[in-house]
Structure formats: structure tokens, C-alpha cells
């Protein structure tokens, strides 16, 4: 990701055009009555007539595009250099910054979640591990990183086959991201209004009853969502907790009915060719749940 950072806003349009070119075979369909338009840099923006009334998160995005500043212009490095090592340093840094949204919200586009109430000045970093796959080399690095923070460091395995690390200091974030990229991992677009970790079969490739191996498909989804680790503005302004999965067997380990977008393997009745049935609109939270419905496409 960080090796692709641009030098200034004048290069953003070119930067995003290169990303889009990689996916030129993906049709871009925007309805005439859509509430958004694409600006000159390639980022989707809510049309003025739909900006009021708006919820707090939408107002935050309208004020400053997180993908544009935090990711493409590498604001993480700049913020990290100013944030210091101690709680007192961080308090001074935040006071001088004068923008709590930058710390508490926009950094989530880079997978950094400030623990303001429970652990001020420390961050939880959520990765993106498509299908939950992690090598021994990758895990050793993650373990050493958590260990380096002593009693402040710990890690979680999430319900979406992912890993998130706690106790991270902002001053270290840039170097951590470089190491993640070196090891073919990233934390990009893992929080707030982005597609969450693409899940697949937990026993993909070794399940004797699997219909398809989900690993190549979750990898492709990861590649698209993150723009190959450089950020993809085409899919960086969604609703919160947007979930996608690929089903590998009839056991439905992936709970496709509870995902926003789910691909379920199916064989064509006419050609015998393998493909997918597509489900959309699944949702679950402590407040409500909705079952995904088939597109029949």
C-alpha cells in the first residue's frame, strides 16, 4: 500500500485512474437518480441536495474524505510522527491537531481504531485476512508485534476469520503497515464504511465434501476491495459493516443468509457449468436481523 502513496493532490486522479484500469472489465453502473456523483479525483461524494439532513458519519465524510487523505496522501505517517510516545505526548498532539474525528474515525479507513475511553492514545489495528488464511511467517510477525507492547498488547480472532491487535501506538503505524505489506497483509479499509473481511470455508482445500475451494475467490474479493493494497475509491464509501462471503460447501459455515453479499456455488441446469447463486441484503446485529434474498440472476 505505502509504496504507492502519491506526492500531492494533483496526482490523485491519475492514481485512482490506474487503480480503476485494473478492473476495467467491471461495469460501472450508476443510476441517474443516484444520491452520489464522482468527483474529479475519482471519489464518490453525496450530492448537495442529499447532504441535509445527514447523520454524523456522513457529515464526517463530507467534511474530509478519509480515503483521499489518510490513505492516498499518507496522513498516517505525518500524524504518527507528531503523536509521541507517552499519554502526555498524545494529549498535546491531539490538542494541537484540534480534530478528534481524525483520530477517532478517519483512521479507521486504515484499520486503526482509537481506544479513547478504555486505553487513551492506543489503537486497535484490524487486519484483512481473506478466508482467515495466515502463514506461520505472518503469524510470527503479528505475535512479535503484540509482544513488543508488553502488558498493553494483545490480539483477538474475530467472527469474520480475522485478526485484530490491541495496544498499537500511532507513532508505529506507518512502519507496521510497511511490514504488513512486505508479508502480503494489510489493514486497509477494514473498518467503518468499507467492505469487511471476505469470509470463506474454514476448511477450504481440505474439506472432502467441498463444492468449491473458496480461497481463490476470497483473495480476488480482497484484491478488488483494497485495490491491490493501495486503496480502491470505487468501494470505500458504503454503509457500515458491509459483509461479503463465498460459500464452499452445503454445510454453510459462512452463514450466507446473514451477509450483505453472498456467493453460493451452483451448477447451471442447462450447461452444467459451475457458477454462483447470489444472495443480497443479509444483516445481523444486537438490535435486528434480516435474511439475505436471492437475486435469481
Give the predicted meaning of each segment:
Residues 2-32, 38-39, 43-49, 59, ...:
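Small-residue-enriched alpha-helical segments and adjacent helix-cap loops
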Residues 76-79, 100:
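Extended, compositionally biased low-complexity polar/Lys-Gly-rich tracts
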Residues 269-283:
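Short, well-ordered strand-loop elements centered on a beta-strand within folded domains, enriched
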Residues 284-297:
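Internal alpha/beta scaffold segment
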